[in-house]
């Protein structure tokens, strides 16, 4: 989501017509194969997303970045391993992500959420209004980290193009939340 906001600004402020965003994460090399608390949550993934200027395309309707204090080391990539406090990450989703989505989601058709995994994704969906279309694909890919939203958009591209207003919401690593509202 942060890369998309940056690409949007570059295209609109610097007369660039196209920008390629590439994401890639290989968390498997940092996860202990015997750690059953983290191993099932993360997948390796990569994406390449071409952002192209169109006069009648989506326009920015608002954005927000929120960084949460990381003093408790709830999700940290240390030298050769990942440490995660699962309950603290779920707390982030419920106490920080949900209220921000509710503030930003007025009049949107669809919310494209980071695919954090079954538990967090289902909790978020249950806390948000049923009036939103909230597609998921964590069942197929797991948590693709920075590639989760690009892959989700690719899988739902026909529907994405039909939407009038959408909200993209990335959250997680570094305990941050980023929202980008787009509309036609």
Predicted ranges, named:
Residues 1-15, 109-184:
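Claisen-condensing/thiolase-fold acyl-transfer catalytic domains that form or cleave C-C bonds
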Residues 92-105, 152-156:
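Short, well-ordered amphipathic alpha-helical segments that serve as non-catalytic structural scaffolds
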Residues 1-2, 27-31, 68-71:
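Short, well-ordered, mixed-charge alpha-helical segments that flank or form enzyme active sites
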Residues 21, 62, 134-136:
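General beta-strand structural signal in soluble alpha/beta enzymes
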Residues 33-95, 99, 161, 171, ...:
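Condensing-enzyme catalytic core mediating Claisen C-C bond formation in acyl metabolism
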Residues 28, 57, 69, 120, ...:
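Flexible, glycine-rich phosphate/dinucleotide-binding loops
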Residues 14-43:
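Flexible, glycine-rich active-site loops centered on histidine and acidic residues
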